[in-house]
From Swiss-Prot:
Pfam families: AAA_lid_4, RuvB_C, RuvB_N. Keywords: ATP-binding, Cytoplasm, DNA damage, DNA recombination, DNA repair, DNA-binding, Hydrolase, Nucleotide-binding. This is Holliday junction branch migration complex subunit RuvB. The lineage of its organism: Bacteria, Bacillati, Chloroflexota, Chloroflexia, Chloroflexales. The gene is ruvB. Homohexamer. Forms an RuvA(8)-RuvB(12)-Holliday junction (HJ) complex. HJ DNA is sandwiched between 2 RuvA tetramers; dsDNA enters through RuvA and exits via RuvB. An RuvB hexamer assembles on each DNA strand where it exits the tetramer. Each RuvB hexamer is contacted by two RuvA subunits (via domain III) on 2 adjacent RuvB subunits; this complex drives branch migration. In the full resolvosome a probable DNA-RuvA(4)-RuvB(12)-RuvC(2) complex forms which resolves the HJ. PANTHER family: HOLLIDAY JUNCTION BRANCH MIGRATION COMPLEX SUBUNIT RUVB (PTHR42848:SF1), PTHR42848. GO terms for cellular component: cytoplasm; Holliday junction resolvase complex. The keyword Nucleus does not apply. Residues 257-347 are annotated as: Head domain (RuvB-H). DNA binds at R312, R317. It comes from Roseiflexus sp. (strain RS-1). It catalyses: ATP + H2O = ADP + phosphate + H(+).
Amino acid sequence: MSRERVVTPKAGEEDQQIEKSLRPRRLAEFIGQEKVVEQLRIAIMAAKGRGEPLDHTLLYGPPGLGKTSLAGVLAAEMGVNIKLTSGPAIERAGDLAALLTNLQKDDILFIDEIHRLNRAIEEVLYPAMEDFALDIMVGKGPGARSLRLKLPRFTVIGATTRLALLTSPLRDRFGSVHRLEFYSVDALYQIVMRSARILGVDCTPEGAHEIAARARGTPRIVNRLLRRVRDYAQVVGNGVITLETARDALAKLEVDHLGLDDNDRRLLRAIIELFNGGPVGLSTLAASLAEEVDAIEDVYEPFLLQLGFLQRTPRGRIATRRAYEHLGVPYVERTIDNGADQGRLWS
Protein backbone atom coordinates (compact mmCIF):
# COMPACT_ATOMS: atom_id res chain seq x y z
CA MET A 1 0.00 0.00 0.00
CA SER A 2 3.02 2.27 -0.10
CA ARG A 3 2.84 3.18 -3.79
CA GLU A 4 1.69 6.70 -4.58
CA ARG A 5 -2.09 6.95 -4.57
CA VAL A 6 -3.96 9.22 -6.93
CA VAL A 7 -6.64 9.72 -4.25
CA THR A 8 -4.37 10.42 -1.29
CA PRO A 9 -5.29 13.72 0.38
CA LYS A 10 -1.66 14.39 1.27
CA ALA A 11 0.28 16.75 -0.98
CA GLY A 12 3.11 15.51 -3.17
CA GLU A 13 5.75 17.70 -4.81
CA GLU A 14 3.71 18.05 -8.00
CA ASP A 15 0.63 19.03 -5.99
CA GLN A 16 2.52 21.74 -4.14
CA GLN A 17 3.76 23.29 -7.38
CA ILE A 18 0.38 23.20 -9.15
CA GLU A 19 -1.66 24.26 -6.12
CA LYS A 20 0.09 27.63 -5.99
CA SER A 21 -1.49 28.60 -9.31
CA LEU A 22 -4.88 27.14 -8.40
CA ARG A 23 -5.28 28.57 -4.91
CA PRO A 24 -7.92 31.26 -4.41
CA ARG A 25 -6.60 34.71 -3.58
CA ARG A 26 -9.68 36.18 -1.89
CA LEU A 27 -12.61 34.94 0.18
CA ALA A 28 -14.92 35.70 -2.75
CA GLU A 29 -12.97 33.11 -4.79
CA PHE A 30 -12.99 30.47 -2.06
CA ILE A 31 -15.43 27.70 -2.95
CA GLY A 32 -17.16 25.67 -0.25
CA GLN A 33 -16.85 25.81 3.56
CA GLU A 34 -19.58 28.48 3.56
CA LYS A 35 -20.06 28.63 7.34
CA VAL A 36 -16.35 28.95 8.05
CA VAL A 37 -15.88 31.53 5.29
CA GLU A 38 -18.76 33.65 6.60
CA GLN A 39 -17.43 33.54 10.17
CA LEU A 40 -13.96 34.53 8.95
CA ARG A 41 -15.41 37.32 6.80
CA ILE A 42 -17.04 38.84 9.88
CA ALA A 43 -13.82 38.42 11.90
CA ILE A 44 -11.80 40.17 9.18
CA MET A 45 -14.21 43.11 8.95
CA ALA A 46 -14.28 43.48 12.73
CA ALA A 47 -10.47 43.33 13.05
CA LYS A 48 -10.02 45.88 10.27
CA GLY A 49 -12.62 48.15 11.84
CA ARG A 50 -10.74 48.11 15.15
CA GLY A 51 -7.33 48.37 13.52
CA GLU A 52 -6.22 45.13 15.18
CA PRO A 53 -4.75 41.85 13.93
CA LEU A 54 -7.01 38.84 13.54
CA ASP A 55 -7.61 36.64 16.56
CA HIS A 56 -5.33 33.61 16.70
CA THR A 57 -7.13 31.06 14.52
CA LEU A 58 -7.07 27.27 14.53
CA LEU A 59 -8.18 25.33 11.43
CA TYR A 60 -8.66 21.59 11.75
CA GLY A 61 -9.98 18.76 9.64
CA PRO A 62 -8.77 16.03 7.27
CA PRO A 63 -5.84 16.82 4.94
CA GLY A 64 -6.42 18.41 1.54
CA LEU A 65 -9.44 20.56 2.46
CA GLY A 66 -7.74 23.94 2.06
CA LYS A 67 -6.34 24.94 5.45
CA THR A 68 -3.15 26.38 3.95
CA SER A 69 -5.10 28.05 1.14
CA LEU A 70 -7.47 29.63 3.64
CA ALA A 71 -4.56 31.00 5.67
CA GLY A 72 -3.18 32.65 2.52
CA VAL A 73 -6.59 34.13 1.76
CA LEU A 74 -6.83 35.58 5.29
CA ALA A 75 -3.44 37.25 4.87
CA ALA A 76 -4.51 38.74 1.52
CA GLU A 77 -7.80 40.00 2.96
CA MET A 78 -6.01 41.62 5.90
CA GLY A 79 -3.32 43.05 3.61
CA VAL A 80 -0.47 41.57 5.67
CA ASN A 81 2.46 39.22 5.14
CA ILE A 82 2.28 35.53 5.97
CA LYS A 83 5.17 33.31 7.05
CA LEU A 84 4.69 29.57 6.54
CA THR A 85 6.20 26.88 8.73
CA SER A 86 5.22 23.57 10.32
CA GLY A 87 5.40 21.91 13.70
CA PRO A 88 8.17 19.45 12.76
CA ALA A 89 10.26 22.26 11.20
CA ILE A 90 10.49 24.14 14.52
CA GLU A 91 12.99 21.95 16.32
CA ARG A 92 14.39 24.38 18.90
CA ALA A 93 13.15 27.39 20.81
CA GLY A 94 15.64 29.46 18.83
CA ASP A 95 13.89 28.50 15.58
CA LEU A 96 10.60 29.87 16.89
CA ALA A 97 12.29 32.98 18.30
CA ALA A 98 13.80 33.72 14.89
CA LEU A 99 10.38 33.46 13.25
CA LEU A 100 8.67 35.65 15.84
CA THR A 101 11.26 38.42 15.87
CA ASN A 102 11.04 38.75 12.07
CA LEU A 103 7.28 39.38 12.10
CA GLN A 104 5.94 42.85 11.39
CA LYS A 105 2.83 44.37 12.95
CA ASP A 106 -0.33 42.37 12.14
CA ASP A 107 1.61 39.70 10.20
CA ILE A 108 0.39 36.10 10.17
CA LEU A 109 2.48 33.12 11.27
CA PHE A 110 1.01 29.94 9.80
CA ILE A 111 2.02 26.72 11.57
CA ASP A 112 0.95 23.56 9.74
CA GLU A 113 0.77 20.31 11.72
CA ILE A 114 0.77 22.39 14.87
CA HIS A 115 -0.04 19.29 16.94
CA ARG A 116 3.55 18.14 16.30
CA LEU A 117 5.15 21.04 18.17
CA ASN A 118 7.16 19.74 21.10
CA ARG A 119 6.30 20.92 24.59
CA ALA A 120 9.41 23.09 25.00
CA ILE A 121 8.45 25.06 21.89
CA GLU A 122 4.89 25.44 23.15
CA GLU A 123 6.18 27.01 26.37
CA VAL A 124 7.87 29.72 24.28
CA LEU A 125 4.78 30.19 22.11
CA TYR A 126 2.33 30.73 25.02
CA PRO A 127 3.54 34.21 26.11
CA ALA A 128 4.09 35.17 22.48
CA MET A 129 0.45 34.47 21.63
CA GLU A 130 -0.99 35.83 24.88
CA ASP A 131 1.20 38.82 25.75
CA PHE A 132 3.06 39.38 22.45
CA ALA A 133 6.31 38.90 24.32
CA LEU A 134 9.26 36.55 24.02
CA ASP A 135 11.00 35.33 27.17
CA ILE A 136 14.71 34.72 26.60
CA MET A 137 17.14 33.21 29.10
CA VAL A 138 20.40 35.16 29.25
CA GLY A 139 23.48 33.55 30.77
CA LYS A 140 23.91 30.19 32.47
CA GLY A 141 23.93 28.77 35.96
CA PRO A 142 23.17 30.90 39.05
CA GLY A 143 23.65 34.12 37.08
CA ALA A 144 21.07 33.28 34.43
CA ARG A 145 18.17 35.68 34.13
CA SER A 146 15.05 35.98 32.03
CA LEU A 147 14.77 38.83 29.55
CA ARG A 148 11.36 39.71 28.10
CA LEU A 149 11.38 41.00 24.52
CA LYS A 150 8.25 42.75 23.29
CA LEU A 151 6.87 41.63 19.94
CA PRO A 152 4.57 43.43 17.51
CA ARG A 153 0.97 42.25 17.60
CA PHE A 154 0.56 39.34 15.19
CA THR A 155 -1.72 36.40 14.41
CA VAL A 156 -0.95 32.70 14.68
CA ILE A 157 -2.95 30.48 12.35
CA GLY A 158 -2.54 26.84 13.27
CA ALA A 159 -3.60 23.90 11.10
CA THR A 160 -4.00 20.32 12.24
CA THR A 161 -5.55 17.05 11.20
CA ARG A 162 -5.44 15.78 14.81
CA LEU A 163 -7.20 18.26 17.09
CA ALA A 164 -7.21 15.80 19.99
CA LEU A 165 -3.39 15.81 20.07
CA LEU A 166 -3.21 19.53 20.85
CA THR A 167 -2.57 20.28 24.49
CA SER A 168 -5.34 22.16 26.28
CA PRO A 169 -3.16 25.22 27.07
CA LEU A 170 -2.28 25.62 23.39
CA ARG A 171 -5.82 25.04 22.17
CA ASP A 172 -7.19 27.56 24.66
CA ARG A 173 -5.01 30.32 23.25
CA PHE A 174 -6.84 30.29 19.92
CA GLY A 175 -9.73 32.73 19.97
CA SER A 176 -11.20 31.32 16.77
CA VAL A 177 -11.48 27.58 16.05
CA HIS A 178 -12.96 26.22 12.82
CA ARG A 179 -13.52 22.72 11.49
CA LEU A 180 -13.23 22.22 7.73
CA GLU A 181 -15.66 19.62 6.41
CA PHE A 182 -15.54 17.41 3.33
CA TYR A 183 -16.85 19.25 0.26
CA SER A 184 -20.11 18.53 -1.53
CA VAL A 185 -20.04 17.25 -5.11
CA ASP A 186 -21.51 20.58 -6.27
CA ALA A 187 -18.68 22.54 -4.61
CA LEU A 188 -16.07 20.20 -6.12
CA TYR A 189 -17.72 20.60 -9.53
CA GLN A 190 -17.21 24.37 -9.25
CA ILE A 191 -13.58 23.79 -8.29
CA VAL A 192 -13.04 21.52 -11.32
CA MET A 193 -14.51 24.10 -13.70
CA ARG A 194 -12.42 26.90 -12.14
CA SER A 195 -9.21 24.85 -12.22
CA ALA A 196 -9.90 23.76 -15.81
CA ARG A 197 -10.15 27.41 -16.86
CA ILE A 198 -6.88 28.29 -15.11
CA LEU A 199 -5.06 25.27 -16.61
CA GLY A 200 -6.55 25.84 -20.07
CA VAL A 201 -8.34 22.48 -20.10
CA ASP A 202 -11.45 21.97 -22.24
CA CYS A 203 -13.87 20.21 -19.88
CA THR A 204 -17.58 19.57 -20.35
CA PRO A 205 -19.96 19.99 -17.38
CA GLU A 206 -20.69 16.24 -17.45
CA GLY A 207 -17.00 15.37 -17.39
CA ALA A 208 -16.38 17.82 -14.55
CA HIS A 209 -19.23 16.36 -12.52
CA GLU A 210 -17.89 12.82 -12.96
CA ILE A 211 -14.47 13.89 -11.67
CA ALA A 212 -16.04 15.77 -8.75
CA ALA A 213 -18.17 12.77 -7.76
CA ARG A 214 -15.07 10.58 -7.34
CA ALA A 215 -12.86 13.07 -5.49
CA ARG A 216 -13.70 11.95 -1.93
CA GLY A 217 -14.94 15.41 -0.95
CA THR A 218 -11.40 16.80 -1.18
CA PRO A 219 -10.23 19.73 -3.38
CA ARG A 220 -6.64 18.49 -3.53
CA ILE A 221 -7.83 15.15 -4.91
CA VAL A 222 -10.24 16.72 -7.40
CA ASN A 223 -7.45 18.87 -8.85
CA ARG A 224 -5.14 15.86 -9.09
CA LEU A 225 -7.82 13.77 -10.82
CA LEU A 226 -8.46 16.64 -13.23
CA ARG A 227 -4.79 16.63 -14.25
CA ARG A 228 -4.74 12.85 -14.72
CA VAL A 229 -7.93 12.88 -16.80
CA ARG A 230 -6.56 15.80 -18.81
CA ASP A 231 -3.49 13.73 -19.67
CA TYR A 232 -5.68 10.81 -20.73
CA ALA A 233 -7.90 13.05 -22.87
CA GLN A 234 -4.84 14.55 -24.54
CA VAL A 235 -3.25 11.19 -25.41
CA VAL A 236 -6.25 8.93 -26.03
CA GLY A 237 -9.04 11.37 -26.90
CA ASN A 238 -9.27 14.72 -28.65
CA GLY A 239 -8.14 16.78 -25.67
CA VAL A 240 -11.67 17.41 -24.40
CA ILE A 241 -12.75 15.95 -21.05
CA THR A 242 -16.17 14.45 -21.73
CA LEU A 243 -18.22 12.16 -19.51
CA GLU A 244 -16.99 9.09 -21.40
CA THR A 245 -13.37 10.24 -21.31
CA ALA A 246 -13.55 10.92 -17.57
CA ARG A 247 -15.09 7.51 -16.85
CA ASP A 248 -12.51 5.68 -18.96
CA ALA A 249 -9.58 7.55 -17.39
CA LEU A 250 -10.81 7.05 -13.83
CA ALA A 251 -11.47 3.36 -14.49
CA LYS A 252 -7.85 2.96 -15.58
CA LEU A 253 -6.79 4.73 -12.38
CA GLU A 254 -8.93 2.18 -10.45
CA VAL A 255 -10.98 4.94 -8.81
CA ASP A 256 -14.57 3.73 -8.47
CA HIS A 257 -17.78 5.75 -8.50
CA LEU A 258 -17.47 6.56 -4.78
CA GLY A 259 -13.82 7.60 -5.03
CA LEU A 260 -12.34 4.46 -3.47
CA ASP A 261 -9.16 3.07 -4.96
CA ASP A 262 -7.54 -0.35 -4.72
CA ASN A 263 -5.87 0.52 -1.40
CA ASP A 264 -9.19 1.41 0.23
CA ARG A 265 -10.74 -1.80 -1.02
CA ARG A 266 -7.74 -3.79 0.22
CA LEU A 267 -8.12 -2.27 3.69
CA LEU A 268 -11.81 -3.17 3.81
CA ARG A 269 -11.12 -6.67 2.48
CA ALA A 270 -8.44 -7.16 5.12
CA ILE A 271 -10.94 -6.41 7.88
CA ILE A 272 -13.59 -8.63 6.27
CA GLU A 273 -11.46 -11.56 5.10
CA LEU A 274 -8.55 -11.64 7.55
CA PHE A 275 -10.39 -10.55 10.69
CA ASN A 276 -13.94 -11.73 9.98
CA GLY A 277 -15.26 -8.20 9.66
CA GLY A 278 -13.69 -7.00 12.91
CA PRO A 279 -13.28 -5.70 15.45
CA VAL A 280 -9.55 -5.49 14.78
CA GLY A 281 -7.06 -3.29 16.60
CA LEU A 282 -5.53 -0.39 14.69
CA SER A 283 -1.92 -1.55 15.11
CA THR A 284 -2.83 -5.09 14.01
CA LEU A 285 -4.65 -3.76 10.95
CA ALA A 286 -1.73 -1.49 10.06
CA ALA A 287 0.74 -4.38 10.38
CA SER A 288 -1.37 -6.61 8.13
CA LEU A 289 -1.32 -3.91 5.44
CA ALA A 290 2.34 -2.94 5.89
CA GLU A 291 1.15 0.60 6.66
CA GLU A 292 1.86 3.15 9.36
CA VAL A 293 -0.75 3.59 12.08
CA ASP A 294 -0.84 7.35 11.43
CA ALA A 295 -1.52 6.73 7.73
CA ILE A 296 -4.50 4.51 8.58
CA GLU A 297 -5.92 7.13 10.96
CA ASP A 298 -5.19 10.29 8.96
CA VAL A 299 -5.42 9.17 5.32
CA TYR A 300 -7.59 6.08 4.97
CA GLU A 301 -10.13 6.21 7.77
CA PRO A 302 -11.70 9.69 7.54
CA PHE A 303 -13.37 9.10 4.18
CA LEU A 304 -14.33 5.49 4.94
CA LEU A 305 -15.97 6.71 8.14
CA GLN A 306 -17.71 9.46 6.18
CA LEU A 307 -19.14 6.86 3.81
CA GLY A 308 -20.27 4.69 6.72
CA PHE A 309 -18.05 1.79 5.59
CA LEU A 310 -16.10 1.64 8.84
CA GLN A 311 -16.90 1.86 12.54
CA ARG A 312 -14.50 2.78 15.33
CA THR A 313 -15.27 0.95 18.55
CA PRO A 314 -13.36 0.55 21.84
CA ARG A 315 -12.43 -2.97 20.67
CA GLY A 316 -11.22 -1.97 17.21
CA ARG A 317 -12.35 -1.29 13.64
CA ILE A 318 -15.42 -2.99 12.18
CA ALA A 319 -16.50 -3.16 8.53
CA THR A 320 -20.17 -2.19 8.16
CA ARG A 321 -22.89 -3.72 6.02
CA ARG A 322 -22.34 -0.93 3.48
CA ALA A 323 -18.72 -2.01 3.04
CA TYR A 324 -19.78 -5.61 2.37
CA GLU A 325 -22.37 -4.46 -0.16
CA HIS A 326 -19.91 -2.18 -1.96
CA LEU A 327 -17.39 -5.02 -2.31
CA GLY A 328 -20.08 -7.52 -3.29
CA VAL A 329 -19.33 -9.74 -0.29
CA PRO A 330 -22.20 -11.52 1.55
CA TYR A 331 -22.81 -9.80 4.87
CA VAL A 332 -22.33 -11.81 8.05
CA GLU A 333 -24.62 -10.67 10.85
CA ARG A 334 -22.77 -10.53 14.16
CA THR A 335 -23.23 -9.76 17.83
CA ILE A 336 -20.62 -8.54 20.29
CA ASP A 337 -21.25 -9.92 23.75
CA ASN A 338 -18.68 -8.62 26.24
CA GLY A 339 -15.83 -10.66 24.84
CA ALA A 340 -17.89 -13.73 23.98
CA ASP A 341 -17.65 -15.32 20.56
CA GLN A 342 -18.45 -12.98 17.70
CA GLY A 343 -19.43 -13.65 14.14
CA ARG A 344 -22.60 -15.64 14.42
CA LEU A 345 -24.07 -16.48 11.08
CA TRP A 346 -27.81 -16.04 10.86
CA SER A 347 -29.81 -17.82 8.26
